[in-house]
Structure formats: C-alpha cells, structure tokens
Amino acid sequence: MVICLSSFPAYACTGITLRTEGGNTVAARTIEWAGSDLESRYVVVPRGYTQRSYVPGGKKDGMLFTSRYGYIGLSVERAEYVVDGMNEKGLSAGLFYFPDCGSYERYDALERDSSVSDLQLVPWILGQCSTVDEVMSAVGRVHVVSADERGSTVHWRFTDNSGRQVVLEIVGGRKMWHENALGVLTNSPDFGWHLKNLNNYANLYPGRASGLEIGGMHLKPFGGGGGLYGIPGDMTPPSRFVRAAFFLSAAPCLSSSEETVMQAFHILNNFDLPIGVQTNMDVAVPDIPSATQWTVACDIGNRRIYYRTMYDSTIRCFDLKATDFVKVKYASHPLDAVKRQPVRFVKVQTD
C-alpha cells in the first residue's frame, strides 16, 4: 500500500531541534496520520545491504543502492519506506508531508537506474552519507520521483553530527536547499514562507505579560504565560510552526543529552493530536487512539534513537554505538509488540 494523501487529507508532522550546553544535537519529531494505523516498524539495516527503489506504477524498477553505513529507521506501511532515522555516523534524516506545494520531475524510464522514490530518499541517504555536504552532493546526482503520483509530495530535513541542519524542497522539479538554524519544520507552505510568517508574531514573548493602567483601572493578566497570548493554537502547519518556534526559543539549554531528549518529548506533547479533531463530521473516525502515531528523538552525538507510540507511551531506545552493523542482520519489527498501553499498578502500603 502507498499512502495516498489525496484520498484522506488528514496529516501533520512537527519537527524540532535542541542542543545541549556541550553542543550535542537532538533532532525530534512527531508523525501524524488520522486516516488509519500506519503499521509502523523499526528497521535495522546493516552495511552492505542492497535495496531497489520503487518507481511510479508500483514497480521495484528504480535505482539499486547498497548501504555504506548501517542505520536504524522508523517506517510507515512498508519496511522500505523509512521516514525517519539515523545512521552510525550520526546523520539524521526525515521526511515531512508537503502537499500542494512541491512538484518533482517527471519519471523517465530511461533514467530508472538513477531514480529514487521520494519515500525511499531517507533510507538511501542514511546508507550513503555522513554529513550534510555529502547529502547535498548525493541528491544532486539522482532523480527524485514520486512513489505514487496520486499522493502528496514531501520535503525533508537532514542533520549531521556538527549540528548543521538543512531542509530540501523540490518545486517545479528543482531541488531547493534551506539552512535551518531555527530547527523547526512542519508541512506546507514552503519553508521560506514559514520563516516570513514568524514576523506576524514579533509582539509575542515568553513569560508573564505586564500590567496596564487604563481608565483608572489597573489591568493585569489572569495567569502566567500571558506574553504568548494570541499565539495560534490550531493544528494547521503554519500554527504548529509558530508554536514550535516559540517553545524552542523559551526552552532552557540543558547540560545532558538525556535531559535534552526528555525535554524534546515534553515540548512535542503540545503537538499530540487527539483522534477526531482532523476528521470531518461526516466521516467515520478511524479506530486508532491518536492521530499522532509516534514521536521520535535522535540523540546525534550519542547515536541513540528514542521513540514512543500512540499505543505505548513508554519511551524506548536504540543504541547505535552498541550495534555492530557488520554482523547484524537486516531486521524489521513492529514498533509495538502489543498494541496496548501498559499500566503499572502501585501497591498501597498498609503498615
């Protein structure tokens, strides 16, 4: 199955990036899909593993590629469709939906040996590149085509061990790169538009709003956080981008990577979309517990990937440094062995 967004336009992704006092980078994000269970899996890919890309029409007839580096990623629908992950060199990559704004070049069967599908660009890059510079060079040598021309386009973010992050958008068949010092990414419109839109909120600031004397009255805010009164609270990509940018700007820089990872999960709690709010009133609500199907955080310096899911909010971790990508075999497993939230009972002491 290919995710065809034209048939169910209820999707969203929010990405943030934090840094520790020592300069380590944590790239985190949510993935939302309110249409059905994405049947997500974690995929372990060793060095030397060979894959072939899908091309429009559903055939595995595109570029053949072999991994130079091992990586672990999270996939949707098919194990080949890794949408976020990190490799052993500390390169993180992820795709975000980009509907109605992007447009790839048309697929040419004569160029199939250098054509990679949009939904397989992440695994190809993770297996080939160690730095953002290498990513930009590699992408320039291939044709990125749609896995399913009925579906949405996507855009991508890439973060390397130095902390540098770039966003790739393909518009009119042209590859456009954006440096992302802000560290935020959502969906449409284009990345440049989101940056300009932040100017509409230059009056906002973290903390308590100041009081005001008016007509002999002393006005004061009802509670803390009044400096952000008016920040957009809906679930559209522009509003999520603004909220994420301001939440990041107010977040303290922490000393340890693990604390920073937990901070990323706390920030992304604000983008956990309940099921039903993205579904039209005349459409049946899918039988899943949340539109936010999983949240992942890549601790780049320590080569650790943390995740939780809509079924189990327990945070789990892969340690890439402890993984031998020469000896390990290719593997693909569901993110949740059991699709049910575990509950730990606390025994009340009676004496």
Specify the residue positions occupied by each region the protein language model found.
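A contiguous strand-loop segment
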Residues: 12-113, 150, 334
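Short hydrophobic/aromatic-rich beta-strand segments that constitute the beta-sheet cores
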Residues: 27, 93-95, 177, 305-308
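Short, surface-exposed beta-strand-loop junctions and turns on beta-sheet-rich folds
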Residues: 33-35, 99-101, 173-176, 312-315
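Proteins synthesized as precursors that undergo proteolytic processing into mature forms
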Residues: 111-145, 149-150, 257-266
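A cross-kingdom feature marking charged/low-complexity
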Residues: 169-187
